[in-house]
Amino acid sequence: MFVDQIKIEVKAGKGGDGMVAFRREKYVPNGGPAGGDGGKGGSIILKVDQGLRTLMDFRYHRIFKAKPGQNGMIKGMYGRGADDTYISVPQGTTVTDAETGELLGDLVEADDELVVAKGGCGGRGNIKFASPKNPAPEIAENGEPGEERKLKLELKVLADVGLVGFPSVGKSTLLSVVTSAKPKIAEYHFTTLVPNLGMVRLDDGRDYVMADLPGLIEGASQGVGLGIQFLRHVERTRVILHLIDMSGVEGRDPYDDFVKINEELKVYDPTLLDRPQIVVASKMDMPDSAKNLAEFKVKLAKDKTLKQVPEVMEISSLTHQGLKELTHRTADVLESTPKFETLAEKEQASKVYTFKEDEPAFKITRDSDATWVLSGEKLERLFKMTNFNHDESLMRFARQLRGMGVDDALRERGVKGGDLVRIEDFTFEFVE
C-alpha cells in the first residue's frame, strides 16, 4: 500500500536528575558535596532512508519516545546521556508541526537528518550549588523534560520528469517501455493508483528519474477523482511530460484535455505552469491520430495557457515510434533547467523577521474552585526541574519565584495569606 501522508507524535527523553550526595571517606571530615549531574535525554531525529518508498511503516507505529538520561551518581559521577532515537523516512519527506503548521524541514538529500524533538538537559547535582556561604548544599535539579511534538509527514516523490494527463492516455505504458519499471497496465481508468518511478538510461550516458503519476480529471484540484492526493508529487518534477491521447477513442477532444489538465495544475500551484512542459502526442499508431494532431496543433498555436507554446512530440509506445527522440529531448531540457528550491529553502528565503515581544514569564488565573493558578513556560520549566524532596531545593524555588516577581504579582491580584496557589499538579498555601 502506498501511504504519502501521516501524522505521528514524538517525545524526546527527559534529562537525568542531579543527585544530592556527600563524601564519606575516612580521614576526610566534612567531605562536602559529591552529587553528580544527570545525563542528557535522547533526541528524536528523522533520517532519510533511500530504501523506503512510502510512509506505510508509520500506519501502525505513530508514537515515538526517546530514552531518558541516567541520573547523577555519588562521588561526583555524571549520568550517562541517552542515545538519540532515529526514525527512517523516505527521501522527499516534508515535516510540518501539526499544531502550528510551521514547516520544520524538507528531507530531499540522501544523507539529510532533522532533529524534531530535543532531549532535555540533565539536572545539576549538589556539587554545582556549593558556595562559600553554603559549602554543603542539599540542592539538586531534576532533569529537563524532553520536547514533545505532533508532526505531519508528507511524501512528495522525487523525480526529474513527471508524466501527467487524463486516465488511460498511455503514461504507464510509456514508463514501462523507456524504463525497467513494471507499473500495472490495464484498459480501465485509474489503473495507476500510486506514483511509479523508473530510471531512464540513454545510450549517451545520461540518465534521469521519470514518475508516472495517477491520472487527473477535471476538478482534481478540488478533490474530484483521486483529487489533490497525487498532485503534490508534481511539485518535485523539473520537467512535465503532458501526455494527450490523439486517437480520440475516449470521445474527448485532445485540445480540451490539454486546457483542463493545465487548469488543474494552475489551481493547485500556479508556478507549475512556469516549468518546462513537453506535449507528448500518444497513440499515434491509431487511425485518426494524425488528423486529430493536425487540428490540435492549430488550436495550440493560439493558446495562451502557458508563457510559450509547448513543444509537441509524437510517440507510439506500442510501435516505439518517437521514443528515442522524446527521451533525448527530455534530457536536453533537463540539462538547461535548474533544480527547484526545496520547501525549506523557499521558507528561509521568504522569511520575514518582525519584532515580537517576549511572552511573560508567568500568568495568573483563577480556577472555578477559587484556587489561584500560575502558568507560563519559564515558570513551569523551573517547577519541573525543582527537586521537592529536599527543603533547600524548595526554598531555592521560592526565592526564584520571588525574583521573578510572582509574590508581588499575586498580592496585586488580591491574593491573601492562606489562599491556595497551584502550579500544574502542586498546590500550596500563600504565606505573607
From Swiss-Prot:
<dbReference type="InterPro" id="IPR036346">
    <property type="entry name" value="GTP-bd_prot_GTP1/OBG_C_sf"/>
</dbReference>
<feature type="domain" description="Obg">
    <location>
        <begin position="1"/>
        <end position="158"/>
    </location>
</feature>
<feature type="binding site">
    <location>
        <position position="192"/>
    </location>
    <ligand>
        <name>Mg(2+)</name>
    </ligand>
</feature>
<dbReference type="GO" id="GO:0005737">
    <property type="term" value="C:cytoplasm"/>
</dbReference>
<dbReference type="GO" id="GO:0000287">
    <property type="term" value="F:magnesium ion binding"/>
</dbReference>
<dbReference type="Pfam" id="PF09269">
    <property type="entry name" value="DUF1967"/>
</dbReference>
<keyword id="KW-0342">GTP-binding</keyword>
<feature type="binding site">
    <location>
        <position position="172"/>
    </location>
    <ligand>
        <name>Mg(2+)</name>
    </ligand>
</feature>
<dbReference type="InterPro" id="IPR015349">
    <property type="entry name" value="OCT_dom"/>
</dbReference>
<keyword id="KW-0378">Hydrolase</keyword>
<dbReference type="InterPro" id="IPR006169">
    <property type="entry name" value="GTP1_OBG_dom"/>
</dbReference>
<keyword id="KW-0460">Magnesium</keyword>
<feature type="binding site">
    <location>
        <begin position="316"/>
        <end position="318"/>
    </location>
    <ligand>
        <name>GTP</name>
    </ligand>
</feature>
<keyword id="KW-0479">Metal-binding</keyword>
<dbReference type="Pfam" id="PF01018">
    <property type="entry name" value="GTP1_OBG"/>
</dbReference>
<comment type="similarity">
    <text>Belongs to the TRAFAC class OBG-HflX-like GTPase superfamily. OBG GTPase family.</text>
</comment>
<dbReference type="InterPro" id="IPR031167">
    <property type="entry name" value="G_OBG"/>
</dbReference>
<protein>
    <recommendedName>
        <fullName>GTPase Obg</fullName>
        <ecNumber>3.6.5.-</ecNumber>
    </recommendedName>
</protein>
<feature type="binding site">
    <location>
        <begin position="190"/>
        <end position="194"/>
    </location>
    <ligand>
        <name>GTP</name>
    </ligand>
</feature>
<dbReference type="GO" id="GO:0005525">
    <property type="term" value="F:GTP binding"/>
</dbReference>
<feature type="domain" description="OCT">
    <location>
        <begin position="354"/>
        <end position="432"/>
    </location>
</feature>
<dbReference type="InterPro" id="IPR027417">
    <property type="entry name" value="P-loop_NTPase"/>
</dbReference>
<dbReference type="InterPro" id="IPR036726">
    <property type="entry name" value="GTP1_OBG_dom_sf"/>
</dbReference>
<dbReference type="GO" id="GO:0042254">
    <property type="term" value="P:ribosome biogenesis"/>
</dbReference>
<dbReference type="Pfam" id="PF01926">
    <property type="entry name" value="MMR_HSR1"/>
</dbReference>
<dbReference type="InterPro" id="IPR045086">
    <property type="entry name" value="OBG_GTPase"/>
</dbReference>
<dbReference type="InterPro" id="IPR006073">
    <property type="entry name" value="GTP-bd"/>
</dbReference>
<dbReference type="GO" id="GO:0003924">
    <property type="term" value="F:GTPase activity"/>
</dbReference>
<feature type="binding site">
    <location>
        <begin position="165"/>
        <end position="172"/>
    </location>
    <ligand>
        <name>GTP</name>
    </ligand>
</feature>
<keyword id="KW-0963">Cytoplasm</keyword>
<feature type="binding site">
    <location>
        <begin position="282"/>
        <end position="285"/>
    </location>
    <ligand>
        <name>GTP</name>
    </ligand>
</feature>
<feature type="domain" description="OBG-type G">
    <location>
        <begin position="159"/>
        <end position="335"/>
    </location>
</feature>
<dbReference type="InterPro" id="IPR014100">
    <property type="entry name" value="GTP-bd_Obg/CgtA"/>
</dbReference>
<dbReference type="InterPro" id="IPR006074">
    <property type="entry name" value="GTP1-OBG_CS"/>
</dbReference>
<keyword id="KW-0547">Nucleotide-binding</keyword>
<comment type="subunit">
    <text>Monomer.</text>
</comment>
<comment type="function">
    <text>An essential GTPase which binds GTP, GDP and possibly (p)ppGpp with moderate affinity, with high nucleotide exchange rates and a fairly low GTP hydrolysis rate. Plays a role in control of the cell cycle, stress response, ribosome biogenesis and in those bacteria that undergo differentiation, in morphogenesis control.</text>
</comment>
<feature type="binding site">
    <location>
        <begin position="212"/>
        <end position="215"/>
    </location>
    <ligand>
        <name>GTP</name>
    </ligand>
</feature>
